Amino acid sequence: MDQRHHPQQPLLLVSTAGDPAVKVDIINGLSGYEFSRLRLIASVGSTVVWTNRTAVTQVVQLNDRVIRLAPGGNDGATALTRFSESGQILGRLRSNRAASITFFITEEFKL
């Protein structure tokens, strides 16, 4: 088919899976317990799936929210949170105060 007569349309990606989900694991790192990621960009309405991959209970502090995760492999080792407004959120591990994760929350999801 001759492409000169059919201009290309921009590709539009549409998700039918619902809200975008972001996965963050707590792992045994080089400097102790840490997050599997340091920085994330997500949109308002995104869900974060937190999973504790360590053998001990972990507590995540997100601004004014606290998430308690049971040791990996046990009930309660995974938790879900959702971003309801835009901005920057800093998360810290109580078991390693040097471990942090920063979320940049935007109004819309960008690929």
For the regions a protein language model found, what residue spans apply to each?
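Asparagine-centered strand-capping/turn motif at beta-strand->loop junctions
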Residues: 51-54
